[in-house]
Amino acid sequence: MNKNQEAISVRLLTADLTDWVLKDFINQYKTTLKEVVVLPSAIRRAKILAQGSSLQIGAVIDYPLAQGTLAKVAFEIGRAFMEGADFLEVWLPASSFMENDRGFAELTETIRSLTLTGGEIRLAVQNEIMNELTKIQVAQRLKEEAWPKIVLGQKQPLAEALHDVSLFSLDGGSQLSIQINPDTVDEQALQSLQAAGAEKIGLSYHVFEELLKDQPSPDVL
């Protein structure tokens, strides 16, 4: 895997993902990929398949709708860490970032406290449905709270992904590590996203395997 591809986080999130596909994918790439993201129901199985490697297993919380209460989200976070997740993406509505200062501070404090029982938590937002002003406000709230990691979008068109990475990189603070999830990507796009400020690029396993087909040698991994 080349340097650009080391930033890739593969997303195995389709509801119809079979155990056979999960097993085949993890067995094939567990010694070369750094991380994969699965649904909560697949955490334990993915951890078993990843044994003997350094592959990190992440999971999504309140995905894709981001409509759960804080109590429900907190419960799901705790359960996911108990199942063995190394990191979590916690999907939040834009309204969560628009709360009064105390409300958002309490939210981030609660989520931070849950990391003490498990691993890393990355906030995730549906920036693809936000207007420009809301994106700026969300980025600024992340900066105010010194939040370290954000995941942006779900299968976002590349041009929009580049724009939003640049925006959050500019307004979210120097502490913010950004992951973007574009709908498609090639080597040039990987370089452009990273140059714009993305530290991780989330790809579906279909897009990831298409990317590998474009490599000059079959043993690129």
Language-model regions, residue ranges each:
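Conserved N-terminal beta1-alpha1 strand-loop-helix module at the mouth
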Residues: M1-M82, R141
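Electropositive, surface-exposed helix/loop patches at the edges of structured domains
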Residues: F97, I121-Q140, I178-L203
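Generic structural signal for hydrophobic
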Residues: F25-Y29, A80-E83, I111-L114, R141-E145, ...
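Active-site-adjacent beta->alpha loops and helix N-cap segments on the catalytic face
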Residues: V38-Q56, Q67-F75, S95-T115, I129-K135, ...
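Short, electropositive alpha-helical surface patch
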Residues: S53, L116, Q137-W147
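Glycine-rich phosphate-binding active-site loops on the catalytic face of alpha/beta enzymes
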Residues: A59-P64, M82-F97, E144-E160, D183-V185, ...
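Hydrophobic faces of well-ordered beta-strands that scaffold small-molecule active sites
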Residues: K3-A15, K34-V38, L55-Y63, D86-V90, ...
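Generic structural signal for short, solvent-exposed loop/turn connectors between secondary structure elements
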Residues: M1-A7, L13-W20, K30-L33, M98-G103, ...
